[in-house]
Amino acid sequence: MAGTVVLDDVELREAQRDYLDFLDDEEDQGIYQNKVRELISDNQYRLIVSVNDLRRKNEKRANRLLNNAFEELVAFQRALKDFVASIDATYAKQYEEFYIGLEGSFGSKHVSPRTLTSCFLSCVVCVEGIVTKCSLVRPKVVRSVHYCPATKKTIERRYSDLTTLVAFPSSSVYPTKDEENNPLETEYGLSVYKDHQTITIQEMPEKAPAGQLPRSVDVILDDDLVDKVKPGDRIQVVGTYRCLPGKKGCYTSGTFRTVLIACNVKQMSKDIQPAFSADDIAKIKKFSKTRSKDVFEQLARSLAPSIHGHDYVKKAILCLLLGGVERELENGSHIRGDINILLIGDPSVAKSQLLRYVLCTAPRAIPTTGRGSSGVGLTAAVTTDQETGERRLEAGAMVLADRGVVCIDEFDKMSDMDRTAIHEVMEQGRVTIAKAGIHARLNARCSVLAAANPVYGRYDQYKTPMENIGLQDSLLSRFDLLFIMLDQMDPEQDREISDHVLRMHQYRAPGEQDGDALPLGSSVDILATDDPDFTQDDQQDTRIYEKHDSLLHGTKKKKEKMVSAAFMKKYIHVAKIIKPTLTQESAAYIAEEYSRLRSQDSMSSDTARTSPVTARTLETLIRLATAHAKARMSKTVDLQDAEEAVELVQYAYFKKVLEKEKKRKKASEDESDLEDEEEKSQEDTEQKRKRRKTHAKDGESYDPYDFSEAETQMPQVHTPKTDDSQEKTDDSQETQDSQKVELSEPRLKAFKAALLEVFQEAHEQSVGMLHLTESINRNREEPFSSEEIQACLSRMQDDNQVMVSEGIVFLI
């Protein structure tokens, strides 16, 4: 642990004089003199000083500043106030204190929350991380003024604690009475307060070691530094590392809480910008012009070269990396430009490998899994601070990936409650929190790339895609594209895949030694707030194409060149900036194809539809066409871009491949076989029933409440074979007579109403013909003849309303 040296007055004045000489650089370059004048003109009170400049001018003082921060910063701030007073005395009286912020190269003191140990206490350190929690901004009293009405005196009191630079904190007791127990009144207008906020930063997920929880550290922000950051921001904090004693009751425990008292907060870029040189820009322009016809195909072919096949999926992922155009309309509505993709398929079809490639290629990507993520873990959570008890807002994965990509593996393993939480993020690009007295809105403008397995583990070809997917339509419509990746048995394709995988295992990177373990995602860390080698990186040459390797690229033709990963990142970064506009021709084509997709969706029910065709599909077509135009570095979305977008949507929505047609034929053959078997079984049962009826006794009646026999027996009850030929002739004569009688519709309706009354009065399901005739013609002006009754009953029999058997009418 670095020992803290308490400066006496002589050393403090000497340090103050050294810092004043450093700021007064009029005879040198006048950098800080100009900065102080700008500070006065901008009405600011914090000066940003580079440690590199101080190290060049006074190396001894710079080392003392880094190792003994509290006393040195107090001297530095006093020197700044004296220097401001020498330039503008009236401005120096406006503020009680002026503050110093540091930047530059900190060397070994440029750390992460994991490497921030006790040896850095009382030192100036620079910590990188992601903001995960932010407390509310609260006023903190610095000086209170109290008035005593009895004595007519005014009492002033200053407050300092361990979060200030003063070496000895004062008592925190707020005075209410003077020495003579006279009550005091607080003069709030004369009291001085400062803003106070506490944030928590967590180490970068890409720098955290695998298998270990990410570390975090609390940062205290005061005055002008508050509200500079929000959850999800990647920042560099320069400040003093200090320990605070942990109190339990009236005693101080042996464990200490450490905080970082910030003096400068620098926001790192949302998009990690690669270093561009003039040569890189020239190569990007040349590549887009020379390959203007097939630039999209070339980039998609070079995407994830270690994965064989999946051409349409690679094109879609390239569109996801490029993105559409985000629009904020005048009426306040938001149209997202991010593209969301869902990959569903059998195991071992490289879904997770495609996700991993996006993690390495996208400028900002956050990986999560379905089982290891909750709804609030993906969006945002409101937590309670253990010490103060106040509410805090904690950012989730989608908020941390703002302006980036969220890769969710095992998407089907999430619960429905957790999946519902991301609905707003996927469409509106923001997270709205309204709970525990906190109403906040966080930006989460990120693309979602999810991978999932079908409901049955493997894709069942005899079920519809919607049954295999098993996700609700409200979620599927938010995905722009949904790809079904099948593991099909094709000897030729299997041979190509096996050859490709074996070549990947035989490849060894240049300079790799035998038995060396390769570090995952290792890179050189820059131990400064600014990249000192930025100009040197600019001069490095970026190759457009990869050097041909027989193991990596196989025995392909020399014409099929692979774009290098470094050039791909730079090209995508430049292409994302372009905002192409729709032409009239492409807009008309997209509208026509959208209406055709809707009609195709409603007309052909046997088509293998993967997701619903809604109004969001129209926006999907526009986003995909815009991304294709970005790949061409075009300022307009032309007809060829719209055609490519429609082709992608047709492939993803309807799966128009030959295998699907074979499956439909096979399914139809199976259905015809089933129908033949059913017909045979029906014939067999009818023959059995005929045999039973021939052996039945004479006069045996049909029981309408016996459902043991099938419905096919019912029409045979009309003409039982046990009846003699005389009854058959009578029945035939009756039917002939009924056919001769002409019935009018009012007459038929009257008969139906009278028949219903007869059944209701009898409270039975069957009535004899004689009783029926008497009941219908009772008290009727125009009675029904027997021919009319037979005609009405035959009409109702044809409509399956009644059944007549052996002089008994049954109500169906």
From Swiss-Prot:
A motif (Arginine finger) lies at residues 477-480. It is found in: Nucleus; Chromosome. The modification Phosphoserine is found at residues 160, 611, 668, 672, 681, 708, 732, 738. GO terms for molecular function: ATP binding; ATP hydrolysis activity; DNA binding; helicase activity. GO terms for biological process: DNA replication initiation; premeiotic DNA replication. InterPro entries: AAA+_ATPase, MCM, Mcm3, MCM_CS, MCM_dom, MCM_lid, MCM_N, MCM_OB. Residues 295-502 form the MCM domain. Its EC number is 3.6.4.12. ATP binds at residue 664. SMART domains: AAA, MCM. Residues 720-744 have a biased composition (Basic and acidic residues). It catalyses: ATP + H2O = ADP + phosphate + H(+). GO terms for cellular component: CMG complex; cytoplasm; MCM complex; nucleus; perinuclear region of cytoplasm. It is an enzyme of class 3 (hydrolase). Keywords: Acetylation, ATP-binding, Cell cycle, Chromosome, DNA replication, DNA-binding, Glycoprotein, Helicase, Hydrolase, Nucleotide-binding, Nucleus, Phosphoprotein. The modification N-acetylalanine is found at residue 2. Its main location: nucleus. It comes from the Eukaryota. PROSITE patterns: MCM_1, MCM_2. The modification N6-acetyllysine is found at residues 293, 547. The modification Phosphothreonine is found at residues 719, 722, 729. Residues 670-681 have a biased composition (Acidic residues). Component of the MCM2-7 complex. The complex forms a toroidal hexameric ring with the proposed subunit order MCM2-MCM6-MCM4-MCM7-MCM3-MCM5. Component of the CMG helicase complex, a hexameric ring of related MCM2-7 subunits stabilized by CDC45 and the tetrameric GINS complex. Associated with the replication-specific DNA polymerase alpha. Interacts with MCMBP. Interacts with ANKRD17. Interacts with MCM3AP; this interaction leads to MCM3 acetylation. Acts as a component of the MCM2-7 complex (MCM complex) which is the replicative helicase essential for 'once per cell cycle' DNA replication initiation and elongation in eukaryotic cells. Core component of CDC45-MCM-GINS (CMG) helicase, the molecular machine that unwinds template DNA during replication, and around which the replisome is built. This is DNA replication licensing factor MCM3. It comes from Mus musculus.
